[in-house]
Curated annotation (Swiss-Prot):
Tissues and organs where the protein is expressed, per its UniProt entry: Expressed by the venom gland.
Propeptide feature: residues: 24-45
Organism (species): Vespa bicolor
General function of this protein: Antimicrobial peptide. Shows activity against both Gram-positive (S.aureus MIC=1.9-3.75 ug/ml) and -negative (E.coli MIC=15-60 ug/ml) bacteria, as well against fungi (C.albicans MIC=15 ug/ml). Also promotes moderate mast cell degranulation. Does not show hemolytic activity on rabbit and human erythrocytes. Its mast cell degranulation activity may be related to the activation of G-protein coupled receptors in mast cells as well as interaction with other proteins located in cell endosomal membranes in the mast cells.
Signal peptide start and end residues: 1-23
AXPX repeat segments: 27-30, 31-34, 35-38, 40-43
Name under which the protein is recorded: Mastoparan-VB1
GO CC terms: extracellular region; membrane; other organism cell membrane
Domain of life assignment: Eukaryota
UniProt-listed GO biological process terms: defense response to bacterium; defense response to fungus; innate immune response; killing of cells of another organism
Length: 60
């Protein structure tokens, strides 16, 4: 029984890789495969010096 489950799991992993399915695609099949990892993310980087200045001003 244990060997059968291991064999089926291994076959599933092999077939998933063979057909080009990633773990994310298996988890969310409706996701756009051409989109980046975070399509709603802000493209501008966070200005750490400005953030630190605001935090210092707020916290005293």
């Amino acid at each position: 029984m244990k060997n059968t489950i291991l064999l089926l799991f291994t076959a599933f992993i092999f077939l998933s890789g063979f057909f080009g399915m990633s773990a994310e695609a298996l988890a969310d099949p409706k996701a756009d495969p051409l989109a980046g990892p975070f399509p709603d993310a802000d493209p501008d980087p966070i200005n750490m010096k400005a953030s630190a200045a605001v935090a210092k001003k707020l916290l005293g």
